[in-house]
Amino acid sequence: MVPSHSIKTPLTGLAILAVLGPSIVWASEYIGSGEVILATRNGAIFGTGIMWVIISGIFLKFWIGMSGARYTVCTGEGMIDMFARMPGPKNWAVWIVLVAQFISATIAVGSIATASGVFLSSLLPVSHSIGGWIVTVFAFLVAWVGRFNWVKVVMSFLVLIMILGVFWVAVIVFPGWSEFLRGFIPQIPAIPDWALAQGVSDNPWKEILPLLGWGAGGFASQVWYSYWVIGAGYGAARKDVYGKPADIVRLKEFTIDEAKKLLGWSRIVYYDSSVAIVLGTLITIGFMIAGAGVLRPEQLAPSGEHVALQLSELFSLRWGSAGGFLFLLGGTAALVGTLVGQLAGWPRLLADCVRICIPAFNRKFKWLMQFRLFLAFFFLSNMIIVYSFNLRPVKLVKLGALLDGLLLTPLQALWIVIGLYIVMPRLYRPEVSKILRPNWVLGTGLIIA
């Protein structure tokens, strides 16, 4: 059970910078193929006129992740344990998550591994296949340790590479402030004739909606942020203690002073999650500017990994090979960061789901073994079945995406509202509950999300 320790005094002022970190892992994970490929392609087709889509998509998901982390700070348990407390039949919400996320985790890593292999092979003299194995084995080893600080160090380094690589290109091809600022005004530009001739649909929403949906990741990314908050030891969470529900007896014993400390930690979560939204927005906009400044003038709208590869080639021809190399390096870092996040996050998520839904599993294995069993399974299922044998279970991929976008994410926002405003207040004494109850702003943001 957690927490069974005293609540640390939260840092204030500039000292808060010393404990920021979950946001780095969160941002590095969710900046993946959607940002590298979709944002660049949309920039090629629409220019910078739809930057508002990036901001909207990331902001709505940010609100879900930040609000879920607020619950974790105040209780010490992750988002999946919160879902187990939903009113109704026992663990019904967790069963939904277990089925849907098991499908996604079993096959999704393989597609990122494929894209990563293509990127790495453009930087090093290795084949696409070998490149995919290299980056995925690296991500597997980072995740295997199971400790937050190691993941944080690796992700921080990858974020720095992303910033350097993407901004180098974006600054050189920057469209000017007037055109740039127009991109923040909601508008739907028409598909240009040259793009229609290349097979792009005449319905702009077919290009825009995937970008909107992938902004800041999917359902799992927001759950994982609560794990990174636990890893950092914010508030009531015990550092790197996973796989345990909140200690209800201890929560009932919280004093007024401890509740005020938790409010301080909640503010740190607001600051930390804001770092994630700023990083994600700036880097994704950087990819869009690169597409608008390099591919659009050449009237090119490639798809898949070819978007970044062709952009790098064209940039190298015009402005030198250093920028083209850095752009590919930034794209590779983004995909590797996503792999690390997925292989560190999904095993935690599924281990929690199985622990709650099948208690015998938790009695038989300690948390680290549970985590590593799922990690090994997802590594093998993706790399052998999906990646090496080139099997793409299209129906499962589409089903996973459909469940995530149309079912899980709206339910996630609803469940967090219930968790914050109905479940959490019952865990404390009335005077403590009154202090920790979130204001109406969080609820409004979740309803919009």
Over which residues does each language-model region extend?
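Hydrophobic transmembrane alpha-helices that form the core helical bundles
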Residues: 92-124, 335-355
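Transmembrane-helix boundary/entry motifs in multi-pass membrane transporters
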Residues: 10-12, 47, 74-103, 123-128, ...
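Hydrophobic alpha-helical segments and their helix-loop junctions in multi-pass secondary transporters
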Residues: 160-200, 208, 218-227, 411-428
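C-terminal membrane-solvent junction of multi-pass transporters and transport-like membrane proteins
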Residues: 157, 352, 362-374, 398-449
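Loop-to-transmembrane helix boundary motifs in multi-pass membrane proteins
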Residues: 128-134, 322, 354-389, 442-446
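Juxtamembrane transmembrane-helix boundary signature
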Residues: 26, 53-86, 97-103, 108, ...
